[in-house]
Amino acid sequence: DHRDLHSFPTRRSSDLTSHAVGLAGGSFSVGTPYVARWFPKNRQGTAMGIYGAGNSGAAVNKFVAPVILVAFGWTMVPQVYAAIMLGTLVLFWLFSYSDPAHLVPSNVKFTDQLKALKDPKVLKYCQYYSIVFGGYVALSLWMVQYYVGEYGLDIRVAALLAACFSLPGGVLRAIGGVLSDKYGAHSVTWWVMWVSWICLFLLSYPQTDFTIQTVNGPLTLHIGLNVYLFTALMGILGVAWAFGKASVFKYISDDYPKNIGAISGIVGLAGGLGGFILPIMFGALMDWTGIRSSAFMLMYGVVWVSLIWMYWTEVRRTEVMGSNAAASPLA
């Protein structure tokens, strides 16, 4: 068909443009060490938390993009976003600075920076971030259809309730940075994982009906979360993961002050891969089990791994409460 031939270049250019936008997202990993190095060690968690709170744009997008689409058509959406990005570029150009002291010395090779990746702690931080960021991204994508399928809600109501998870998960990252500076990355991450474990345990339980034989005959009981309890638990989980995203990067600034760029990049990559792979696994699990809450069962198991790993490598050697808990045990 000649129409398909004419549309091929358009599709190809659209794909290339999409890849370019995705590559631009890598600037987040560049910005993390850039921001951190302007602040003393005891304020780096707060600085990176405020910077990382920009992730809340993903939640705001759920409200803004549909409004623009309905009012002006889909072509206006990328135009508006392009204008915002251009404005941000101008502001950055006018008000940002460069300090040569923040640069890696020329005698330090790129391969030397990557040697830190052999450190088992880096793998552990990748695992933590694959939960608090990768899980956040994955569930943000999954929640709307979960509400529609599990509770029969209208898609507009479902999107609004899903924002109760995704919006705090971005905005409150700054508070997580403040807490990490005050109490230490380890203490904040430890409690984040326990709160996640409790929430995911409750969220994992599927809607269940069971019958008990009593002296008066069969008694059927129902166990399951209603939409209000479910949304409340998701909100708590979103807040916990917001704090966790900040505390993981506080670990990095504490343990690798001279190599924040390379380490934060690989940890960020782990989070991005989690956000990509987990929705696929959610769908596969639901197809295999027929249980929608199997997504939370998977996340529950992953959090178990984090808690066990953290206990054997950190908790046994440090306090998580009290005056001696303020510093990372690995710093």
What are these regions (language model features)?
Residues 173-184, 286-287:
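Helix-to-loop junctions at the C-terminal end of transmembrane segments
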Residues 1-13:
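Short, small-residue-biased leader/transition segments that mark boundaries at the very start
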Residues 120-171, 245:
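Extracytoplasmic gate region of multi-pass secondary transporters
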Residues 99-126:
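Juxtamembrane intracellular "pre-TM" segments in multi-pass secondary transporters
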Residues 50-96:
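Helix-loop-helix hairpin linking two adjacent transmembrane segments in secondary transporters
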Residues 82-103, 306-314:
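C-terminal membrane-cytosol helix-exit motif in multi-pass small-molecule transporters
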Residues 17-54:
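Cytoplasmic helix-loop-helix junction between adjacent transmembrane helices
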Residues 186-248:
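C-terminal transmembrane helical hairpin of 12-TM major facilitator-type secondary transporters
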